[in-house]
Amino acid sequence: MSTIRPVFYVSDGTGITAETIGHSLLTQFSGFTFVTERMVFIDDAEKARDASQRILAASQRYRVRPIVVNSCVNPYLSVILAESGALMLDVFAPFIGLLEHELNTSRHSRIGRAHGMVDFETYHRRINAMNFALAHDDGVAASYDEAEVILVAVSRAGKTPTCIYLALHYGIRAANYPLIDEDLNSDQLPLRLRPYRKKLFGLTINPERLQQIRQERRPNSRYAALDTCKREVAAAERMFSAERITTLSTTHTSIEEISSKVLVTLGLQREMF
């Protein structure tokens, strides 16, 4: 069996739902190379037929059955896509019938509801959270009074992408603070962070992985040297331990998992947008 499998994320909207679920599923299987492609706004029969032909062409090119993660709400479009002969993983079909029976009502197909601008208040909260994350990135903010979360870590340990994810998907006002040499000379929290202890969450990372990331940013620099990475990570972990700050390693942890851990640890109840 070929270890290369073409995968298509097909949606009548942006494709975020299909890609998120598909990625979560595929990460459970090692030893394969998944060649992925997004097909978005497939919202009529003509577009569905074109998509089906492209999927069929991929099966001929790779000589293996493609995988389709489908989030189209119109079942007719799903039938057309299935004509490609691909393995169809329908995001909604297994659950719609169960919900219709339980709620004693028929569904109303609404394209893009999962990630669309459902109402202005929700959209406004998301944008404000995003602006907050950018304004409070890398310790540039004068105050953290309005922050709901403050991620603390050495440089390039995953603070910024996690803050942005929390803002976009949960509307969380997330700030981050980079630990610099001056901070790492002590096992105590930096003075700026001490008033916000209950908002802090520490991120750590394998030094070898940190070196790889820093090497891409500043090749062959002292900043990217392995001994620098080891020293900074060890000092940060000593501080987190001494101050009893909950920590999580980002080395083999997805942003989704990190974000979920942060929300649970800090007791933030927020629905995903």
From Swiss-Prot:
The answer to keyword Nucleotide-binding applying to this record is yes
Task: Write down the top EC class of this protein.
Answer: transferase
Catalysed reactions, as listed in the record: [pyruvate, water dikinase] + ADP = [pyruvate, water dikinase]-phosphate + AMP + H(+); [pyruvate, water dikinase]-phosphate + phosphate + H(+) = [pyruvate, water dikinase] + diphosphate
A GO molecular-function annotation? ADP binding
A single Pfam family it belongs to is Kinase-PPPase
Record: residues binding ADP: A153, V154, S155, R156, A157, G158, K159, T160
Write the Enzyme Commission number(s) for this entry.
2.7.11.33, 2.7.4.28
Query: Which UniProt keywords are listed?
Result: Kinase, Nucleotide-binding, Serine/threonine-protein kinase, Transferase
Key word Membrane present in the record? no
Task performed by this protein:
Bifunctional serine/threonine kinase and phosphorylase involved in the regulation of the phosphoenolpyruvate synthase (PEPS) by catalyzing its phosphorylation/dephosphorylation.
Give the family this protein belongs to, as stated in its UniProt record.
Answer: Belongs to the pyruvate, phosphate/water dikinase regulatory protein family. PSRP subfamily.
Q: What is this protein's record name?
A: Putative phosphoenolpyruvate synthase regulatory protein
Q: Whose protein is this, by species?
A: Xylella fastidiosa (strain 9a5c)
Taxonomic lineage per UniProt? Bacteria, Pseudomonadati, Pseudomonadota, Gammaproteobacteria, Lysobacterales
